[in-house]
Amino acid sequence: MFSEESNPSSHKGQFDPLALGELLASRSPNQRELLEVRIYRGLPSSSRDPRGYAAARAQIAHWQTDSRVTVVTRPLRYPKPEWSADLKPTEKGIDVQLAVDFATMAVREQYDTGILFSRDTDLLPALEFVYSKSVVARCETASWRNGNKPHGRLTIGKFQPFCHWVDAADFALIEDATNYVRS
């Protein structure tokens, strides 16, 4: 995101999700205690991409050394062999899983403030649901800001939930420079 390199290494741009959660909680205008950070990500195939799979598992294990971190994975979808070799695997179902959890956990009163760090408009129905239906849960968003240029944020019609802007200086505080790929 904030790399100066034209072709950065695969581990450049990584951040520590717990450090991000702590940063957002510490900057809130309300006193908050960070109870959980949830990460949703695709998981490489152990047979099609053993190095990527091992790196992902190492990263997840590192994140989960703190009991406040929950990682939700779904298998990456790989292109069929007859398709272009340039096609990369894609995440499928991650946004749906995140949306279901965001809404379900609000209804069950499992959080009082949920911060959705995404610009994926597929998540708007979940944000709208929590905003309009939840009695207890408050929804907020987070998004990257590069210099004076915000990268966009999720909004609900004319309502703009509070947005936590994260910039390059913040990224320097939460960056994870670990290379999880084994040589």
Regions found by a protein language model. Give the residues of each.
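Domain-level signal for Mg2+-assisted phosphodiester chemistry and nucleotide/NA-binding surfaces
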Residues: 1-89, 145
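Nuclease catalytic cores that cleave nucleic-acid phosphodiester bonds
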Residues: 70-183
